[in-house]
């Protein structure tokens, strides 16, 4: 089902872009603030800006991240990012609802909650069931293993921003019976948060036109960028795919905004990667336990460019890595020797956090369905541990995550006894040897 939907999206992408012209994206704020529609000199996509910059703001188009080392106030940790984002919208008429499980038990087409809108598909979006509030916000943990050949997983630790589980700040309004709001109000709120909370100047904000689809629905979207980072995607859900390969208009128009909550924290801290901002004391413990240290000056220069290494977006990843190394004035092999162990810790911390959330919500590593994906990341974490001879106590690591996360997501405590009972770290030696080969392949 996911493959069929992905195929439909690819087929319709260009057609939909033609359908959604300038008039589909121009909101009142653009007119009032003097935003102009331009075509990016790098990717040729259309975007809106108040500056004379010829680039859309996407990481690869502007040459990397431009906010590294630029702390905003005291910076927000993971918990502060969730709270401050929710508080902003609650003060502006939104109701915060409890997040849904990451294991999508109410869906028969996907194993995991992949976006906050998943919580409301298909029944709320189709008007069959009333939304729990309107408008609403939900700090929804999401799991994604997508990409060609698990490339999303391969990106973890390398691009500085990829996570297999992330918290999507879902901002939703359902337009019916005079309730909800539409594009103008959506971008008003969006721009206010970016400029007042994240302290971006007007000229630093750009909105890139695109089309987003997921869960059988789609619509035009405006991706908001600041200093080389996509912070939020504003989707204006208006259509549904049909069984005969076409599409129809939805009776209820839905504001489907997905904020990258971990990205917000990363942006405010200006830390080298999203992992320092997200995992906090857990990553500190990992570094202390393994003795991994790194050239901070090299790491600082590298992470600015690391966003250019997205496996899904680069035709030749080896060449891209060589190019990054060349810009840093270092051989690719030496760069890997310097940063490889740290990138492995990033991946291990990500994968184990994902497992904690999934297991707390009833997911178990196995050979079938979504459980197979969980097994993949478990094996990859164990493999990287073996490859670099970290000798980590994984049971302790899982409990470190639980202790840190429970401040905001108390339900992760449910994973504690299950992890102990499953003995997840007791894997046979032949399997571990195969896993080491897998880890080497992924490097």
Positions of PLM-derived features:
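Short, intrinsically disordered terminal segments enriched in charged and Pro/Gly residues
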Residues: 6-31
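Short, flexible, mixed-charge glycine/proline-rich loop motifs
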Residues: 27-35, 46-50
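Short cysteine-rich clusters marking metal-coordination/redox-active sites
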Residues: 40-43, 56
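Cysteine-rich micro-motifs
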Residues: 51-64
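Structured aminoacyl-transfer and RNA-binding surfaces used for tRNA recognition/handling
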Residues: 66-376, 385-401, 410, 414, ...
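Aromatic/basic-lined ligand-recognition segments
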Residues: 381
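Single conserved hydrophobic/aromatic residue that forms the stacking wall/gate
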Residues: 425-429, 433-443
């Amino acid at each position: 089902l996911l493959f069929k939907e992905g195929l439909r999206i690819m087929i319709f992408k260009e057609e939909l872009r033609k359908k959604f012209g300038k008039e589909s994206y121009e909101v009142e704020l653009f007119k009032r603030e003097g935003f102009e529609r331009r075509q990016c000199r790098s990717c040729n996509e259309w975007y809106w800006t108040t500056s004379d910059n010829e680039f859309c703001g996407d990481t690869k188009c502007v040459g990397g991240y431009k906010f590294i080392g630029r702390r905003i106030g005291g910076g927000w940790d993971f918990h502060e990012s969730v709270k401050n984002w929710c508080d902003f919208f609650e003060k502006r008429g939104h109701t915060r609802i409890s997040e849904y499980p990451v294991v999508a038990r109410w869906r028969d087409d996907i194993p995991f909650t992949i976006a906050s809108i998943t919580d409301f598909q298909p029944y709320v979006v189709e008007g069959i069931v009333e939304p729990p509030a309107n408008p609403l916000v939900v700090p929804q943990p999401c799991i994604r293993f997508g990409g060609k050949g698990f490339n999303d997983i391969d990106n973890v630790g390398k691009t500085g921003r990829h996570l297999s589980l992330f918290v999507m700040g879902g901002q939703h309004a359902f337009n019916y019976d005079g309730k909800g709001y539409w594009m103008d109000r959506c971008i008003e709120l969006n721009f206010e948060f970016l400029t007042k909370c994240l302290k971006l100047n007007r000229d630093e904000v750009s909105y890139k036109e695109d089309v987003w689809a997921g869960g059988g629905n789609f619509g035009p979207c405006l991706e908001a960028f600041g200093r080389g980072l996509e912070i939020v995607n504003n989707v204006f859900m208006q259509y549904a795919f049909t069984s005969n390969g076409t599409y129809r208009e939805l009776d209820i128009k839905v504001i489907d905004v997905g904020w990258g909550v971990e990205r917000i924290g990363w942006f405010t801290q200006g830390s080298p990667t999203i992992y320092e901002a997200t995992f906090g004391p857990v990553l500190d413990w990992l570094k202390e336990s393994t003795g991994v240290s790194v050239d901070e000056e090299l790491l600082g220069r590298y992470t600015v460019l690391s966003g250019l290494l997205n496996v899904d977006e680069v035709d030749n990843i080896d060449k891209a890595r060589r190019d990054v190394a060349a810009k840093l004035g270092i051989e690719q092999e030496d760069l890997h020797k310097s940063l490889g162990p740290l990138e492995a810790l990033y991946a291990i911390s990500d994968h184990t956090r994902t497992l904690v959330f999934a297991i707390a919500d009833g997911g178990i590593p196995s050979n079938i369905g979504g459980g197979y994906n969980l097994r993949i990341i478990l094996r990859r974490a164990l493999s990287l541990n073996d490859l670099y001879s970290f000798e980590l106590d994984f049971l302790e690591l899982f409990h470190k995550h639980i202790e840190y996360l429970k401040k905001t997501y108390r339900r992760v405590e449910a994973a504690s006894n299950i992890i102990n009972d499953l003995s997840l770290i007791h894997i046979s030696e032949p399997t571990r040897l195969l896993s080491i080969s897998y880890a080497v392949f992924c490097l």
